[in-house]
Amino acid sequence: MDKNLNLIVMLTHNDKTVENAYEIFYKCKNSKAKFWGFKEKPLPLDQMKKLYKYMKKNGKTTFLEVVEYTEKEGLEGAKTAVECGCDILMGTVFFDSINEFCKKNNLKYMPFVGKVTKRPSILEGEIEEIINEARLYLKKGVYGFDLLGYRYTGNILKLNRDFISNINAPVCIAGSINGYDKLDELKNINPWAFTIGSAFFENKFDGTFEEQINHVYEHVKK
């Protein structure tokens, strides 16, 4: 895939990992998607480790997205990512302790920016403040950002466009990407990556799970 617009397939529905995640990945491992992940809840750790190991065996880049807002829970999520051998930790509210832990363990860290609350998450805050927050975290050495662009309570298109044009780091637009219209918007602003989870389970891109993955992959490559 190109340098940007990487599809991250999330084996999640309504911000929770589905129970049959392993089975779905097994069926779809030969799809065109190279980036795969899921959430920190509710699979037991041993099942998470088994699935990540199988993903890595199949040459995938792996993500754990942690939808937690306290330092303690965020750090627990980071520890889980390391224990599972994940490539990239997405989510958590930024804390220096999490950032330092990720650096020490060679885990790429892409925290949330802005005011993120609830589950499924929503994003609030002024666009300029969100961008300035990201710049501060970049100075502290984060790899990139988990931007909940389509969960934003303000001007979504302006946030996504302004954030990506102002931040020189990998940006993943995560959450609520559920139609070709949004894929076309993403093609225009060209983020490093985007996630799709629930929309695949709700058959928003027509076909089997694997067919939907390939439809999305091919659409953003056009």
Task: Describe the residue ranges of each PLM region.
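Catalytic cores of alpha/beta
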Residues: E71-E83, G125-E129, L159, S165-N166, ...
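Conserved N-terminal beta1-alpha1 strand-loop-helix module at the mouth
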Residues: M1-T62, Y69-K72, K79-G85, L138-K139, ...
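N-terminal small/glycine-rich loop or linker at the start of catalytic domains
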Residues: M1-T12, Y52-K60, F101-I122, I156-S165
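Glycine-rich phosphate-binding active-site loops on the catalytic face of alpha/beta enzymes
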Residues: C84-S97, K140-Y152, S176-I177, K182, ...
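Hydrophobic faces of well-ordered beta-strands that scaffold small-molecule active sites
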Residues: L5-T12, W36-F38, T62-V66, I88-G91, ...
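Conserved anion-binding
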Residues: G59, V67, K72-Y152, K221
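Generic hydrophobic/aromatic pocket-lining and core-packing "Φ" positions
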Residues: F25, Y52, A78, N99, ...
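Charged helix-capping and loop-helix junction motifs
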Residues: K49, E124-N132, N155-R161, F209-N214
